[in-house]
UniProtKB/Swiss-Prot annotation:
Protein task: Scaffold protein that may play a role in cell adhesion, cell spreading and in the reorganization of the actin cytoskeleton. Plays a role in the regulation of cell proliferation. May act as a tumor suppressor.
Pfam families the UniProt entry points to: LIM, PET
GO molecular-function terms, A-Z: zinc ion binding
Keywords: Cell junction, Cytoplasm, LIM domain, Metal-binding, Repeat, Zinc
Comment field on protein domains: The N-terminal and the C-terminal halves of the protein can associate with each other, thereby hindering interactions with ZYX.
Domain PET per the UniProt entry, residue ranges: 92-199
InterPro entries given in the database record: LIM1_Testin, LIM2_Testin, LIM3_Testin, PET_domain, PET_testin, Pk/Esn/Tes, Znf_LIM
Compositionally biased tracts (Basic and acidic residues): 155-164
Compartment(s) where it occurs, according to its Swiss-Prot or TrEMBL record: Cytoplasm; Cell junction, Focal adhesion
Domain annotation LIM zinc-binding: ranges: 234-297, 299-359, 362-421
Descriptive protein name: Testin
Source species: Callithrix jacchus (White-tufted-ear marmoset)
GO cellular component: cytoplasm; cytosol; focal adhesion; plasma membrane; protein-containing complex
BP terms from Gene Ontology: negative regulation of cell population proliferation
Length: 421
């Protein structure tokens, strides 16, 4: 029965997003179909984050699971006992303040996520300080950006062994220990504050995933326009520019009370993308997204995108691979000991390369074997042989000789070129 449930669970995972169009390949992709062990589409080879997959409760569960067995556990348990989902992203509808006039229709903006604060004015200002193309307004480019970063920065297979491909019991145990360690030592959630709220003692606040928000509204702070442009004693930990009194700032508990960030500066130190939903990992005085924190701790398989917990793995082309996943990107044939060619940083076996990627010789019109020498000029190639690299007029061998290229033809002299004109 356990095996049956596991197989069913795996099948459901592969059904998620099935048929969703690719935003990158457009009509060239028949629709999203998850590869059996790679985290890509079988049809177009793009990742799930490149497809228009609707966010489901699975994303909420993924983020909620991230906070299990942390200091937030008791709060999560209370939310569950109250009948509230373990995690629910903070969808917020913000009202335009100028719309309060009589006979003026109310103008609202729906965000798919907003910072967990009670004060709408503070949340609105936080959003306005983000680049417009990254503001998660429902149905916008920014919402698509957030969805993509959720998949990229917080992959489920970095926290849940059941989302990985055929881990051994030892690997499962080691992964569980690794996840437990980063939850206790590195994982955190940013909190939106006003600089004036930061005192020597530090705020005694706790982030509640999906429940009531513990950050109190800043009374009168947003109405005091005169304070908005005054510098404070704080400077942004990222850009080093001073923080303004009336502007929201992000505080990260693991970094300490002496560090604040502008909303647009709260980014991963490796990929420099906004930390999605302000979820961060702190290490060596730097912010990381989940993916790049894990990359700094463990090798990642370039085939399946999972972290490697096996004692034996291979390294090739400055990348790491599970032994069973060092395969041809086209046919999935294992490449150990075989000749392969790198195409767009992906290994391809020799037969697949010749079939799908090899350049065609202008002389014999056959594919050029990757191990064979060739002559290339602009976008044209020839076998470097006495049978192929010849004058297009008199058939004189041009290897080691001067030649005159004309589109796909080559000539040994002006005379031969004129004769073919």
């Amino acid at each position: 029965m356990d095996l049956e449930n596991k197989v069913k669970k795996m099948g459901l995972g592969h059904e998620q997003g099935f048929g969703a169009p690719c935003l990158k390949c457009k009509e060239k992709c028949e629709g999203f179909e998850l590869h059996f062990w790679r985290k890509i589409c079988r049809n177009c080879k793009c990742g799930q984050e490149e497809h228009d997959v609707l966010l489901s409760n699975e994303e909420d569960r993924k983020v909620g699971k991230l906070f299990e067995d942390t200091k937030y556990t008791t709060l999560i348990a209370k939310l569950k006992s109250d009948g509230i989902p373990m995690y629910k992203r903070n969808v917020m509808i913000l009202t335009n303040p100028v719309a309060a006039k009589k006979n003026v229709s109310i103008n609202t903006v729906t965000y798919e996520w907003a910072p967990p604060v009670h004060n709408q004015a503070l949340a609105r200002q936080y959003m306005q300080m983000l680049p417009k193309e990254k503001q998660p307004v429902a149905g916008s480019e920014g919402a698509q950006y957030r969805k993509k970063q959720l998949a990229k920065q917080l992959p489920a297979h970095d926290q849940d062994p059941s989302k990985c491909h055929e881990l051994s019991p030892r690997e499962v145990k080691e992964m569980e220990q690794f996840v437990k360690k980063y939850k206790s030592e590195a994982l955190g959630v940013g909190d939106v504050k006003l600089p004036c709220e930061m005192d020597a003692q530090g705020p005694k606040q706790m982030y509640i995933p999906g429940g009531d928000r513990s950050t109190p509204p800043a009374a009168g702070a947003m109405e005091d326009k005169s304070a908005e442009h005054k510098s404070t004693q704080y400077s942004c930990y990222c850009c080093k520019l001073s923080m303004k009194e009336g502007d929201p700032a992000i505080y990260a508990e693991r970094a300490g009370y002496d560090k604040l960030w502008h909303p647009a500066c709260f980014v991963c130190s490796i990929c420099h993308e906004l930390l999605v939903d302000m979820i961060y990992f702190w290490k060596n005085e730097k912010l990381y997204c989940g993916r790049h924190y894990c990359d700094s701790e463990k090798p990642r398989c370039a085939g399946c995108d999972e972290l490697i917990f096996s004692n034996e793995y291979t390294q090739a082309e400055k990348q790491s691979w599970h032994l069973k996943h060092f395969c041809c990107f086209a046919c999935d044939g294992i490449l150990a000991g075989d000749i392969y060619v790198m195409v767009n940083d992906k290994p391809v076996c020799k037969p697949c390369y010749v079939k799908n990627h090899a350049v065609v010789c202008q002389g014999c019109h056959n594919a050029i074997d990757p191990e064979v020498q060739r002559v290339t000029y602009n976008n044209f190639s020839w076998h470097a042989s006495t049978e192929c690299f010849l004058c297009s007029c008199c058939s004189k061998c041009l290897i080691g000789q001067k030649f005159m290229p004309v589109e796909g033809m080559v000539f040994c002299s002006v005379e031969c070129k004129k004769m073919m004109s």
